[in-house]
C-alpha cells in the first residue's frame, strides 16, 4: 500500500513539475442560487480541449419491420431431431459414392502417370 501511495505521489509531483506555472485562481465568490459546483477554466495546453466539437450523426434509413426477429441480422441456427432410417441410408450412400469417386480418380491418375 505504501508503494502505491509513493508511486502516486511521484506521478503527481512529475505532472505538477511539467505543467507551466498558472496564475492563481481568483477568489471564490459564491453563486446566488445555483446547485452544483462551477466548472474549472479550460486549460489550453491539453491535447484535447474541454469543449468538444460535437455534431449529431445523420439518421440512417428506418429499418423494415422484422417481426419477432427484432434487429438481429444473423441467421438463427435451426436444429433438427435425429434422422430417420431413410435419411441415414441416403447419407451413407452419398459418402460411399464420394469415396468411390475419389478412389477411381486416384486410379486414373496412377494409370496416366505410368509409362509403357
Swiss-Prot record:
Domain VM: 36-73
GO molecular function: structural constituent of vitelline membrane
GO CC aspect terms: egg chorion; extracellular space; vitelline envelope
A GO biological-process term: vitelline membrane formation involved in chorion-containing eggshell formation
Expression tissues: Expressed in stage 10 egg-chambers, localized in the outer eggshell (chorion membrane).
Family named by the database record: Belongs to the vitelline membrane family.
Function, as annotated: Major early eggshell protein.
Protein name from the UniProt record: Vitelline membrane protein Vm32E
Species name: Drosophila melanogaster (Fruit fly)
